[in-house]
Swiss-Prot record:
Its main location: nucleus. Gene3D superfamilies: 3.30.70.330. The gene is Cpsf7. This is Cleavage and polyadenylation specificity factor subunit 7. Contains an Arg/Ser-rich domain composed of arginine-serine dipeptide repeats within the C-terminal region that is necessary and sufficient for activating mRNA 3'-processing. PANTHER family: CLEAVAGE AND POLYADENYLATION SPECIFIC FACTOR (PTHR23204). Residues 82-162 form the RRM domain. Component of the cleavage factor Im (CFIm) complex that functions as an activator of the pre-mRNA 3'-end cleavage and polyadenylation processing required for the maturation of pre-mRNA into functional mRNAs. CFIm contributes to the recruitment of multiprotein complexes on specific sequences on the pre-mRNA 3'-end, so called cleavage and polyadenylation signals (pA signals). Most pre-mRNAs contain multiple pA signals, resulting in alternative cleavage and polyadenylation (APA) producing mRNAs with variable 3'-end formation.
Length: 471
């Protein structure tokens, strides 16, 4: 029992010590304080408004605390925004040219220059981003650079923002749409001009005279070829119909048929060629418009140009005949025609007989000279364009070619020809030169008249020498 009492006393002491160390009243007071502190704010809010001012004063430092963060982000944006977009210049502008223009306004701290390029071909889009080292340089660029002219175009300068970037990109697309059909020709890089040309198709031709004409002139001369470039090789197709000259030469004596023949052979080209004429609308196409006015004169477009065209492609004789083709039918009567033809036949037959006899005797130069003289006389007659006259001329030419071939084959080996040349004080080289001159003059119709006069004088001198030799 005593041990139990001791124990009880001990526990009682401990409990007492605990009570002494941790007083229940204090604990109760503490809890009461906490409870009262928790209950007081609600009473204060409902009763008085003094505590809120400190609460309102506490957010005040928060902006002060956030101010450095805002300034920091703004300074970062400023470092990014120390750049501008410079645009509306031509695609062939170089970085050196752009830097020179920037330096001309007093900005020397260009850090970087980025050109916007087309991914397809690497071509400049006409604008670039200019990065500078200071905000002051940005202000200078925005204020002073827009008035500058670069390669004939006024430069457009805007801050480096997404909105301005999209605007410059849209302008570049418009310029690209205008430039694509013209191939590699320098485009009109000014944004206003490009927008005008995109809105109205007539502006490229109207902008031929305005300012910056030296830059706009190459593109503005070619607006009509926006579609035909793919069809331009067709300009080489009209010559294929030219092979019909042979039928023309056969029916040249009758004036009415050639126009019909030309029109039939040249009917396919008309739907191809009018696009190249550009200015005149290909509405109702008369027979004259199937010809290219750059090569054929328009006044003679009804019947004249087709014969001239084909005569130029054919021999000079046909060309010469085409010039004389007009007058004979209207000025020569039936009786006069028959008389001239009778005289031409006599000239042809006598010239052939004399040439054959001279060639058989070895005097090839005289034979050639006789035939050339006869050909010249018949071709200068008023009925030279008639089919019968051309038959006479062709027979004379055949005889001439045969004698020339024979003279070349014989050469200088014939003793009789050598003696005749020596007696006439002519060397074989001179004889060959004379025959060569005959042949050249025969194929050169423009000098036909001079040749005829020269042949007459030479023929007279030759006859005088022959007469002196025989007497």
């Amino acid at each position: 029992m005593s041990e139990g009492v001791d124990l009880i006393d001990i526990y009682a002491d401990e409990e007492f010590n605990q009570d002494s160390e941790f007083n229940n009243t204090d604990q109760i007071d503490l809890y009461d304080d906490v409870l009262t502190a928790a209950s007081q704010p609600s009473d204060d809010r409902s009763s008085s408004t003094e505590p809120p001012p400190p609460v309102r004063q506490e957010p005040a430092p928060k902006p002060n605390n956030k101010t450095p963060a805002i300034l920091y982000t703004y300074s970062g944006l400023r470092s990014r925004r120390a750049a501008v977009y410079v645009g509306s210049f031509s695609w062939w502008t170089t970085d050196q040219q752009l830097i020179q223009v920037i330096r001309s306004i007093g900005v020397y701290d260009v850090v970087e220059l980025k050109f916007a390029e087309n991914r397809a071909n690497g071509q400049s889009k006409g604008y670039a981003e200019v990065v500078v080292a200071s905000e002051n340089s940005v202000h200078k660029l925005l204020e002073l650079l827009p008035g500058k002219v670069l390669n004939g175009e006024k430069v457009d300068v805007r801050p480096a923002t997404r909105q301005n970037l999209s605007q410059f990109e849209a302008q570049a697309r418009k310029r690209e749409c205008v430039r694509v059909p013209r191939g590699g020709i320098p485009p009109r890089a000014h944004s206003r001009d490009s927008s005008d040309s995109a809105d109205g198709r007539a502006t490229p031709s109207e902008n031929l005279v305005p300012s910056s004409a030296r830059v706009d002139k190459p593109p503005s001369v070619l607006p009509y070829f926006n579609r035909p470039p793919s069809a331009l090789p067709l300009m080489g197709l009209p010559p294929p119909p030219i092979p019909p000259p042979p039928p023309l030469s056969s029916s040249f004596g009758v004036p009415p048929p050639p126009p019909g023949i030309h029109y039939q052979h040249l009917m396919p080209p008309p739907p191809r060629l009018p696009p190249h004429l550009a200015v005149p609308p290909p509405g109702a196409i008369p027979p004259a418009l199937h010809l290219n006015p750059a090569f054929f004169p328009p006044p003679n477009a009804t019947v004249g140009p087709p014969p001239d065209t084909y005569m130029k492609a054919s021999t000079p004789y046909n060309h010469h005949g085409s010039r004389d083709s007009g007058p004979p039918p209207s000025t020569v009567s039936e009786a006069e025609f028959e008389e001239i033809m009778k005289r031409n036949r006599a000239i042809s037959s006598s010239a052939i007989s004399k040439a054959v006899s001279g060639a058989s005797a070895g005097d090839y130069s005289d034979a050639i000279e006789t035939l050339l003289t006869a050909i010249a006389v018949i071709k200068q007659s008023r009925v030279a364009n008639d089919e019968r006259c051309r038959v006479l001329i062709s027979s004379l030419k055949d005889c001439l070619h045969g004698i020339e071939a024979k003279s070349y084959s014989v050469g200088a080996s014939g003793s009789s020809s050598r003696k005749r040349h020596r007696s006439r004080e002519r060397s074989p080289s001179r004889s060959r030169e004379s025959s060569r001159r005959h042949r050249d003059l025969l194929h050169n119709e423009d000098r036909h008249d001079d040749y005829f006069q020269e042949r007459n004088r030479e023929h007279e001198r030759h006859r005088d020498r022959e007469r002196d030799r025989h007497h």
